[in-house]
């Protein structure tokens, strides 16, 4: 009897980036094949070129329908978008053509999931400048998913080993982020990370909430957001039965979370969460002056479908050199499978 394995759609990311490389390397592994049935969404010619660069012994099966996939060893099933002119294809190039291709790949993988043709989605890195050059005015994957799934309440969760970070706001200016520190928004974010932790196997998650200002304002010396918005949100969350503490200064919250005191961290803005997260998940090779390995997964919460992603960028400077690490892509696929397998724990949205 064959063991059930979910079908996972993987958008390859920007065709000029390391996205195709990390995608091909990941789906070629036994680790990925053992847990799911992957379908790559992207341009088949770019992926064929990538296979040749990596030297992997793989063949491409071009498909236009999910039921045409073979899911066989040595075969990469590719939902061929035919959206890149391979004769003019250049690695590391920022362009409207590649931005449009990346955008189309993402929209297609969303469409397949919304139609229940695949069980989860994983995304490779896109270049925000290229996307916008193509006329698609989105600040990132998260906003594209929200638009094409008609989702109003959503959040970004970063996961790396025992560090789990969720943001009250993400792709807005720092000035706007301060304005978004509101009681109701913080409560919603606490609820989202509590549910997400339970879905990845943490039965009674303990949540730490960061302050916004230095030292969490030290009783109002450095700002009012803690007293007016964050503390009331925490009190309300406690009333609702959530195990939550705060506000905690970031430089205290993260060492404790890494040490296992907190199962999840709620932060107020993008860099407050991304900087410590990437310090933990990214490994810089001092001798070679390049990233040695990159781990970490981005999970979009609140969507009607599952979406995980690598938490690294396009790395245009090393695209096409066969030196990009597939670790984060493998981890993203593993989390997509894990979330799919715990759908019964889902309340509303992921």
Question: Where in this protein do the model-derived segments appear?
Answer:
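Flexible loop/hinge segments that line or gate small-molecule binding clefts
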Residues: 139-166, 170-173
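Active-site glycine-rich loop that binds ribose-phosphate moieties when present
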Residues: 143-152, 174-196
């Amino acid at each position: 009897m064959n063991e059930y394995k979910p079908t996972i759609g993987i958008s390859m990311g920007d065709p000029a980036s390391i996205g195709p490389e990390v995608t091909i390397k990941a789906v070629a592994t036994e680790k990925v094949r053992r847990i799911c049935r992957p379908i790559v969404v992207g341009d088949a010619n770019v992926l064929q070129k990538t296979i040749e660069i990596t030297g992997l012994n793989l063949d491409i099966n071009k498909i236009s329908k999910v039921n045409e996939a073979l899911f066989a060893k040595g075969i990469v099933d590719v939902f061929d978008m035919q959206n890149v002119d391979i004769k003019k294809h250049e690695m590391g190039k920022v362009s409207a053509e590649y931005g449009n291709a990346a955008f189309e790949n993402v929209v297609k993988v969303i469409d397949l999931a919304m139609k229940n043709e695949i069980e989860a989605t994983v995304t490779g890195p896109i270049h925000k400048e290229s996307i916008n050059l193509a006329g698609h005015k989105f600040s990132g994957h998260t906003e594209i998913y929200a638009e094409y799934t008609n989702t109003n309440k959503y959040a970004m969760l970063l996961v790396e080993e025992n560090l789990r970070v969720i943001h009250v706001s993400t792709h807005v200016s720092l000035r706007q982020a301060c304005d978004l520190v509101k009681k109701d928004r913080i409560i919603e974010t606490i609820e989202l990370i509590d549910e997400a932790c339970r879905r990845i196997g943490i039965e009674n998650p303990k949540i730490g909430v960061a302050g916004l200002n230095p030292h969490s304002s030290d009783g109002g010396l450095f700002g009012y957001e803690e007293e007016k918005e964050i503390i009331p949100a925490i009190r309300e969350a406690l009333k609702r039965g959530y195990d939550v503490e705060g506000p905690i200064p970031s430089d205290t919250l993260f060492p404790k979370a890494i040490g296992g005191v907190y199962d999840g961290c709620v932060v107020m803005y993008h860099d407050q969460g991304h900087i410590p997260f990437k310090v933990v998940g990214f490994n810089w090779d001092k001798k070679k002056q390049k990233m040695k390995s990159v781990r970490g997964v981005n999970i979009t919460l609140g969507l009607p479908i599952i979406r995980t992603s690598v938490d690294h960028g396009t790395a245009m400077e090393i695209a096409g050199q066969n030196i990009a690490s597939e670790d984060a892509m493998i981890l993203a696929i593993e989390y997509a499978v894990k979330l799919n397998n715990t759908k019964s724990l889902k309340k509303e949205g992921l």
